């Protein structure tokens, strides 16, 4: 079997990374804005899986994560099997955001949804749309987070017709502060314990 590469999927990090570096440098210059609220960034978290802000008694952590091309798999499976997989895809989207957030020691609190379709017709398929909603709700319950809201743009001409781009943002807290796991808190010999939630 021939291995698949990011390049074959249209992802060229040699072209993407310069933008990411420029964005991180520009973003770092805005960190001083937090001081007007009495807050400060945890510099070691910049560029990591989640961004962390010191708000005094605890740390605030946030992340946004896109599912990527996995929705294409759900569409292909629906064509092959006739079964709807959007409840599972919803859970995958939340899992990606929550998993990134917990890497810094944060407890996730709130998830927001971003569901951008290639046109209003995508949302008009009631079975698929309701599966997405129910899967999203179920994932929130499993992760112990509130679903705060979100955005559902119909982006004809930007997103391909008949497709959807799924993403989630997640906000949480690191409390007590000693749970923070970035920078010097990570190193050789460290141990990370994960408690199973019973999902197979």
Task: Give short role names for the model-derived ranges.
Residues 1-40:
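N-terminal amphipathic/basic leader segments beginning at the initiator methionine
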Residues 28, 35-199:
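Glycine-rich phosphate/pyrophosphate-binding loop regions near the starts of catalytic domains
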């Amino acid at each position: 079997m021939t291995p698949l590469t990011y390049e074959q999927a249209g992802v060229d990090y040699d072209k993407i990374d310069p933008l990411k570096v420029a964005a991180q440098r520009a973003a770092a210059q805005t960190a001083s804005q937090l001081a007007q609220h009495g807050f400060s960034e945890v510099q070691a978290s910049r560029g990591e899986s989640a961004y962390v802000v010191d708000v005094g008694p605890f740390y605030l952590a946030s992340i946004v994560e896109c599912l990527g091309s996995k929705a294409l798999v759900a569409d292909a499976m629906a064509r092959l099997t006739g079964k709807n997989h959007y409840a599972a895809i919803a859970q995958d989207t939340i899992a990606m955001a929550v998993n990134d957030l917990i890497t810094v020691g944060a407890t996730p609190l709130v998830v927001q949804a971003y569901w951008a379709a290639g046109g209003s017709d995508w949302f008009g398929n009631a079975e698929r749309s309701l599966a997405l909603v129910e899967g999203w709700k179920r994932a929130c319950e499993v992760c112990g987070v509130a679903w705060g809201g979100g955005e559902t743009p119909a982006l004809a001409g930007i997103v391909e017709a008949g497709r959807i781009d799924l993403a989630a943002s997640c906000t949480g807290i690191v409390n007590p502060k000693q749970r923070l796991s970035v920078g010097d808190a990570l190193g050789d010999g460290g141990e990370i314990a994960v408690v199973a939630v019973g999902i197979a």
